[in-house]
Amino acid sequence: MSTAHILIIEDDDLVSRTIERSLSDSDFQISRTNNGLDGIKIARKSSPDLVILDVIMPEIDGYEVCRRMRSDAQLSDIPILFLTAKIKDEDKVNGFLAGADDYLTKPFNIDELALRVQAILRRTRRQNGAQLNETGDNHYSPYARQIMQELQQQRKTPVERSTLVVGDYVLDTQTYELYTPTHGKVRLTPIQYDLVHHLMNNPGQLFSPARLLDEVWDYPLDTGSPDLVRVHIKNLRDRVEKDPAAPEFIRTVPGFGYTVEQKAVLD
């Protein structure tokens, strides 16, 4: 496996060098810069596997850097870990709304940072593994059947090996794209892909926020906030649901959590 490339965008040189030394000891390749604009340029040039991003910086802050990366087709899928002195819950929520994958507050434990980096990279690497979907063609909805036929024409191997299908929604595990009946093809961020993949791979199951934090994103027990899950669910619904206020794909079961359900095909 090739060495992962980590880009550190941090204006505090001492903090930046400390992170660099620690991650270099774990055999990561490191690039550093002290401002957001240069960070975006470096990311475009080198396509890092992960960005560690400070919030408070000169010129443009970390939130704006994150938003620009998420709106850039070349950079939109790169995982981003916010590292900042901002500790209020609303600051964390703002970071996730901007598109962050994880959030660590200063002062931080350098070993915890390394573990979070490794967890994010593990989640990203899972995307390379195709999952076998055993649902037969006769059970596909008309929309899903059309998508599956189009994908099969592009591939030499059975398309069922690299897709998950629930109702009208088709997840392509090779391209990390979700085909939806109202928004067409949607390219998911790594954290959105992991969430959708887990739910679609377990249709009908209920997942509490704590269970999703543990099973999808490798958060240790009793860590992570349910608010983070709600933000990720909201962002995802905004992208894939016909009416995010009345979701039909990812449903909320009050008091229990979230689920996707396989509806019967009547045609």
Regions found by a protein language model. Give the residues of each.
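Positively charged, aromatic-enriched patches within helix-turn-helix-type DNA-binding elements
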Residues: 179, 183-190, 194-231, 235-248, ...
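A structural micro-motif at secondary-structure boundaries
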Residues: 159-193, 259-267
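Active-site beta3 strand of CheY-like receiver
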Residues: 46-52
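Receiver (REC) domain active-site loop signature in two-component systems and cognate sites
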Residues: 57
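Two-component/phosphorelay signaling modules centered on CheY-like receiver
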Residues: 12-32, 45
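Conserved Asp/Asn-Gly motif in the active-site loop of CheY-like receiver
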Residues: 33-37, 92
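Basic, amphipathic DNA-recognition helix from helix-turn-helix-like DNA-binding domains
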Residues: 77, 81-165
